[in-house]
Structures are given as C-alpha cells and as structure tokens.
Regions:
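Metzincin-family zinc-dependent endopeptidase catalytic domain
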Residues: 1-114, 118-122
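C-terminal or late-domain output modules
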Residues: 38, 46, 147-153
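Post-HExxH zinc-binding segment in Zn-dependent metallohydrolases
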Residues: 108-152
Length: 153
C-alpha cells in the first residue's frame, strides 16, 4: 500500500528464495538468512543453507561420491543441521524477526554473545544454541528492547 511506502514503517519480506550478498573482500557470493534494509528480507532457504553444517559433514561428503554413501552421511548427521520442512524453523524465524527489528531500530542486528537471540550464527550449531537452546536475549539487548517497547507505547 502507498501509505506504507516510507521509512517510518518496517517491512519484512519472507521468501523461500536463497538470498546472497557479494563480498568485495573475497569476491564471492555468500548465502544470507537476513538481508538488512527496509524492507528487510528473511530467506527461509537462507536459514537452512547459509549457516554452515559441521565441518566433518563436508569432509565426509567430499570423500564419498556415491548416492548411497551420501544418504548414509546425511543419516549420520541427522539433527545436527536444519533440513527443508524441519519443525524447528518457526522458532528460528522468531529470532530472525527480532534481528530485523533491532536492525531497523538501532542499525545493528547482531550480538557477539552466542547465548543471545541476536547472535550472528555462521554455523548451524551456533544457530541451535542462540535460537533454540536459550531463546533469550542478553541483558544488553533486553534493555534495548524495553526502550523500544516504551518508545512505541
């Protein structure tokens, strides 16, 4: 709607398309779960594909080329990374929505504390800690959230 075409309203787009950004430092594209702007884009495919799976998983895949062996490797690591249709995805999306709100309100979506829902997880195991294991924000970001709520109220 035309009344929402301004920077005073946060718009979040959810897509199943893989979003990427180009890094000038290494001249590569990197998959992203969240692309910060307004509108902010949250990619459900990016949530699954962007954070890396366990290192040993990739090593096992590189040394086993048959289709049967690949299926065995996937079984071996089942539960250690997200898959399409995974029942944990909605809980993880909540954390990305929080990151989107913080990016819009403060210009900074992420936290260095892996116990905070705003942690920028580069590995699936870290994603599970910050988004599923703890499901809370650190004290610093909890205080900022209270200020944001008070500003809106």
């Amino acid at each position: 709607p035309s009344e929402e075409k301004n920077q005073d309203i946060l718009n979040i787009i959810f897509t199943n398309k893989l979003t990427c950004t180009f890094d000038e430092n290494d001249f590569r594209y990197h998959a992203r779960a969240l692309v910060g702007s307004n509108p902010i884009i949250i990619s459900t495919t990016g949530i699954i594909e962007a954070p890396a799976k366990p290192k040993q998983y990739y090593l096992d895949l590189m040394t086993n080329f048959s289709k049967e062996e690949i299926e065995e490797i996937k079984k071996k690591y089942k539960g250690q990374f997200l898959e399409y249709g995974d029942s944990r995805i909605p809980d993880i999306i909540e954390g990305y929505v929080l990151q989107a709100i913080f990016y819009y309100e403060t210009g900074d979506a992420f936290c260095d504390n892996n116990q905070c829902r705003l942690f920028n997880s580069h590995w699936q195991k870290d994603l599970f800690i910050s988004q599923l294991g703890n499901k809370k924000m650190c004290k610093k970001h909890e205080e900022i959230l209270i200020k944001i709520k008070n500003k809106i109220a």
